[in-house]
Amino acid sequence: MILSFDEAGDLLDQMAEEFPEEFYRDLNGGISLLPQAVEDPAGEELYIMGEYCNDMMGRYINLYYGSFAALAEQENWTEEDWEDELYTTLSHEFTHHVEGLAGERGLEIRDQLALEQYKQEQ
């Protein structure tokens, strides 16, 4: 099942309201659902589902609808799968944000190690 961009956005809005207000501290760019699919720049058959950004524009979270839709099509997702994947990704990116505020990089390091392990197994 492929949710429309608007349906996915509505789900994401509902989920975002469930997170504590403290998580939004200094997240001046908020959370955006962008239409594109983003593939791994290294050319692997991997999609980037979301990213936490801290740059000249500020701190913000981008989630990529097209990446979710591509996997949903490949894996024949249900609405529950959409909910799980959106929530997991949003939680993951919030963790990057909160760690960043604390000057930590633990999740960033774990992400890199997991990606390296995945590439070795392929």
Please give the residue ranges for each predicted region.
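Active-site scaffold of zinc-dependent metalloenzymes
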Residues: 44-87, 97-119
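A conserved beta-strand element that flanks and buttresses the S-adenosyl-L-methionine
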Residues: 90
